[in-house]
Amino acid sequence: MTWTVAVAGATGYAGGEVLRLLTAHPEVEVGALTAASSAGSRLGEHHPHLLSLADRIVQPTEAEILAEHDVVVLALPHGASGAITAALEELASGGRSAPLLIDCGADHRLISQQAWEAYYGSDYAGAWTYGMPELLHHGETRARAQREELAASRRIAVPGCNVTAVTLAVQPGIAAGLLDPSRLTAVLAVGYSGAGKALKPHLTAAEALGSAQPYAVGGTHRHIPEIVQNLEVAGAAAGAARLSFTPVLVPMSRGILATVTAPMTAALREAPDPEAALRAAWDDAYGATGSGESLIQLLPEGSWPITGTVLGSGTATVQVAIDRGAEAVVAMCAIDNLGKGTASAAVQSLNLALGLEETTAITIQGVAP
């Protein structure tokens, strides 16, 4: 069977990366490509690298157009998905077959309406099934429950890119009770495509090249409640997780390198061999190199994640170590923000929801150097 897939927000970075993957997917046919501000233009004007779709005409982002497809992937700005998904739901309630909806934006990620209103300040659109198949649930050493939820879902919210990097870095230690979630510190080096395609003065070459720019400092970044939500799913007590989160834009187009520091719990400090206990938790969650999670690579001891190796891929690389002097654990994760951080996660969830092999059409290998 071949499924038709429409992409809303097709001219942006996330939409373009979704399309790049879908053009190589053997089980889907790319349908309508929509964008509110670019309707009537050729897709090739926005994504000249997508040669097979270059002559396709961008259509308006309207529910009636999107509803004609089996799957709709939304790659819209935060706050824009809620209205179009509500319109699609209304059409479905009228007897029309409802498409599988996959939202790459933030609108349906947060379970807490209070958290949404505090960080986003707009109307709450409700939570959908969370599109991180590798998310550990309390009591799990290998992710199964989230995959089961996705396989049964018709409404999926793709995680935030920074959220993915931080969650994958530390969740094994939270699930195993080895990390204290009350004093987590995350510093992320983030590529400029994470800021979107719209022109902004601080993103011009003259401002960005040769410069690192912190942003959303002091607990204001919108991904904080989403990370906390994930850590609570993994086993942190409700309200116990506290995260200091500082992202820094660095002069690269794609990529995230997350460095997360967490205090050791007594269980880890008092273990006969703390290093072995720590390594075992990550190995249980992700598997030794070449086994376990297909899209997460736990690196050999002494090797650290770098963004170049995951560029253009749907893979995450992770590593963990103990800082004895600080009595803390340092966990790191590198991803491509448009790959594992967005588009690959969307396609991975699409595959699960359609009953397909999870990694179909997802690029495993990076393109560096």
What do these predicted regions represent?
Residues 19, 167-171, 224-228, 279, ...:
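Predominant activation on well-ordered alpha-helical scaffold segments within soluble catalytic domains
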Residues 27-66, 75, 188, 192-331:
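C-terminal substrate-binding/catalytic lobe of Rossmann-fold NAD(P)-dependent oxidoreductases
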Residues 330, 334-337, 347-369:
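C-terminal lid/capping helical subdomain adjacent to the catalytic/cofactor pocket in oxidative enzymes
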